[in-house]
């Protein structure tokens, strides 16, 4: 799905979907390359430190660059597998190793405080429909696998609509 393979299949057989096109999925699955692309458009992103498996790194340098708290995540993984929120520099190395269990590249990104929202858009027969904005409220520390797939989050449409019209 997130690699673009499932989206590509749906596109080929003409089934509408609310996920990104297969090309966009492929672009965004490599988080490091996607952030470089976004930065090339002069858009702001979280501060980032990229590590390849086997590369030497210094946790103090990483913490200084991105700050604490921060997120450690596999570069090419979906569904929040391998992601950790790190609130103590002493845990950074362990969480980097945890993320490496999902792949050969890891990103450490600065924590951005705020609300998380989702907006679906669907095109059917050339007609674009924008679905309602929803705020994601995780019962966990962040929007992790359990929050996404095991019901440990709430989507709050009414609150987002109130904020948007207020």
Tell me the role of every PLM-derived stretch:
Residues 1-29, 44-47:
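A short, GP-enriched loop/loop-strand-helix hinge that lies immediately N-terminal to
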Residues 2-6, 81-82, 118:
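Short glycine-/acidic-enriched loop or helix-start segments at secondary-structure transitions
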Residues 87-165:
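Phosphate-binding site of ATP-dependent enzymes
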Residues 5-9, 66-68, 149-151:
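Short hydrophobic/aromatic-rich motifs at helix boundaries and adjacent loops
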Residues 18-20, 79-80, 157-158:
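Short small-residue beta-strand/loop micro-motif enriched in glycine and branched aliphatics
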Residues 27-115, 126:
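Active-site nucleotide/adenylate-binding loops and adjacent lid/helix of ATP-dependent enzymes
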């Amino acid at each position: 799905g997130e690699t673009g393979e499932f989206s590509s299949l749906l596109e080929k057989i003409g089934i509408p979907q609310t996920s990104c096109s297969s090309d966009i999925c492929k672009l965004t699955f490599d988080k490091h390359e996607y952030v470089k692309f976004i930065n090339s458009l002069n858009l702001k992103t979280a501060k980032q430190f990229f590590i390849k498996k086997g590369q030497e790194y210094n946790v103090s340098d990483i913490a200084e660059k991105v700050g604490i708290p921060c997120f450690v995540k596999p570069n090419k993984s979906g569904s929040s597998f391998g992601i950790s929120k790190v609130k103590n520099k002493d845990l950074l190395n362990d969480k980097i190793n945890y993320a490496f269990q999902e792949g050969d590249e890891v990103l450490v990104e600065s924590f951005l405080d705020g609300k998380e929202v989702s907006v679906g858009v669907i095109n059917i027969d050339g007609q674009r429909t924008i679905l309602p904005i929803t705020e994601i409220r995780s019962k966990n520390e962040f929007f992790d696998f359990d929050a996404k797939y095991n019901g440990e989050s709430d989507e709050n449409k009414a609150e987002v609509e109130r904020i948007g019209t207020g």
